[in-house]
A protein has these predicted regions:
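N-terminal amphipathic/basic-hydrophobic helices that include classical n-h-c signal peptides
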Residues: 1-11
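Structured C-terminal cap/extension of enzyme domains
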Residues: 4, 16-25
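Extreme N-terminal starter segment of soluble prokaryotic enzymes
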Residues: 27-29
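Non-cysteine beta-strand/loop elements that form the S-adenosyl-L-methionine
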Residues: 57, 110-119
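A structural preference for short, pocket-lining loop segments at secondary-structure junctions
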Residues: 105, 112-113, 124-125, 129
Length: 154
C-alpha cells in the first residue's frame, strides 16, 4: 500500500478523493479515534509500527477549536510522520463546524471525521455524538457547511 505523505497528499488533484486513493491500494487500515489515547505521541508510535495506518485524533469540540488558540495548538500540532491524519470533531452548530474545519485545514491535516457515534450520556445529552444520528437535519447542515468551507475530505 502506498503511504500517503504530506507531499503526495498535497499533489493530489482532488483532496476529497483521499479515501478512493487509499481503497485502490487494498484494505484501509485505520486507528479509530479514542478519547484520552490517540494523541500525537501515540499516533507516532502506531505509524512507526504500521506506516500504512490512517490515524485519527481524539475528539475535539468544534466550538473549542473555533475559540481557543490553546486548544488548536494542542489538538492540531502534529508530526509529519502521522500522515494520513484525520481529526475528529464533535458539536452541533454547523457554523462552528465550518469554522473549525477551516482551522483544521490550515494546519495541513488530511481530513475531518464528524463524531456521530459517541454514546456517552453527557455527550448525547448536549446534542452531540450519537444524538446527531437522530437529528439528521442538523447532521446534514453540519456536513454541508463543512463541505462548502474546505477542500479536505470530511
Amino acid at each position: 500500500m502506498q503511504t500517503v505523505t504530506p507531499h503526495t497528499y498535497n499533489t493530489m488533484t482532488s483532496k476529497k478523493d483521499f479515501w478512493k486513493l487509499l481503497a485502490q491500494k487494498g484494505p484501509i487500515v485505520a486507528l479509530a479515534p479514542m478519547d484520552g489515547y490517540t494523541d500525537s505521541p501515540y499516533r507516532q508510535i502506531v505509524k512507526k509500527i504500521a506506516p500504512e495506518t490512517v490515524v485519527f485524533s481524539e475528539f475535539y469540540s468544534a466550538d473549542g477549536l473555533m475559540h481557543s488558540k490553546e486548544l488548536q495548538k494542542k489538538a492540531l500540532t502534529h508530526d509529519p510522520n502521522e500522515y494520513p491524519l484525520i481529526i475528529q470533531i464533535f458539536g452541533k452548530d454547523p457554523h462552528a463546524f465550518a469554522e473549525a474545519a477551516k482551522i483544521i485545514e490550515g494546519y495541513g491535516i488530511t481530513g475531518i471525521d464528524v463524531n456521530m457515534g459517541c454514546p456517552a450520556k453527557k455527550v448525547v445529552k448536549s446534542g452531540h455524538g450519537s444524538s446527531l444520528m437522530i437529528e439528521r437535519e442538523t447532521a446534514f447542515h453540519i456536513i454541508e457547511a463543512m463541505s462548502h468551507a474546505v477542500q479536505i475530505p470530511i
